[in-house]
């Protein structure tokens, strides 16, 4: 188990640490706000906050994970170790950006709750996203960051064992409209029948008849 010291355990902190450490890397993570308990812990441990306690493995926080609600935040994306990163922190931190806040920002789709231009279906457009604007939309940056964190943890705590991860592939189909013919209403159905006949789309006309008439 990896023990994390933080002055405040918030739902955001608990969620993102468990996502990275447990769901992605496969190790258990615990939290404490007690300095004595942290210092007495003999196993792998790290602190997360504004300042380190001493010489422990330290990850400096941006501050977003201790806030409540949605607020506009300034983000500067930069290159780091052949990938992208944001929420930069000082060189006191073991990683030069707040990996946990950056991951939470993407996992929670934080930017979609901020004012934005919607597409024709009233949705947040991918073209408005941070990933698209900085050319990492198709890159699994959270996983990349997590496995770079794994290397750091292995170097710092050789006794910390990581299980082999088993992966499965699931196919997803994004359908803007659930049904081609059903639930269109009488008027739109009549328009569809008329359009099929006018354009001689007989197969589609017959299929529409079977679907609409049951």
Predicted regions and their residues:
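Terminal accessory/targeting
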Residues: 1-214
């Amino acid at each position: 188990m990896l023990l994390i010291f933080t002055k405040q355990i918030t739902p955001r902190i608990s969620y993102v640490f468990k996502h990275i450490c447990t769901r992605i890397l496969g190790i258990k993570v615990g939290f404490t706000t007690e300095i004595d308990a942290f210092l007495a812990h003999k196993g792998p441990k790290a602190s997360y906050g504004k300042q380190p306690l001493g010489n422990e493995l330290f990850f400096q926080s941006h501050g977003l994970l201790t806030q409540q609600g949605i607020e506009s935040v300034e983000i500067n994306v930069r290159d780091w170790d052949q990938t992208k990163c944001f929420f930069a922190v000082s060189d006191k931190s073991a990683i030069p950006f707040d990996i946990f806040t950056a991951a939470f920002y993407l996992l929670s789709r934080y930017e979609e709750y901020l004012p934005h231009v919607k597409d024709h279906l009233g949705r947040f457009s991918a073209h408005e996203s941070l990933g698209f604007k900085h050319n990492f939309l198709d890159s699994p940056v959270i996983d990349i960051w997590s496995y770079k964190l794994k290397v750091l943890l292995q170097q710092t705590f050789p006794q910390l064992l990581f299980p082999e991860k088993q992966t499965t592939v699931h196919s997803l189909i994004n359908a803007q409209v659930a049904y081609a013919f059903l639930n269109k209403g009488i008027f739109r159905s009549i328009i569809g029948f008329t359009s099929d006949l006018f354009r001689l789309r007989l197969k589609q006309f017959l299929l529409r008849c079977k679907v609409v008439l049951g």
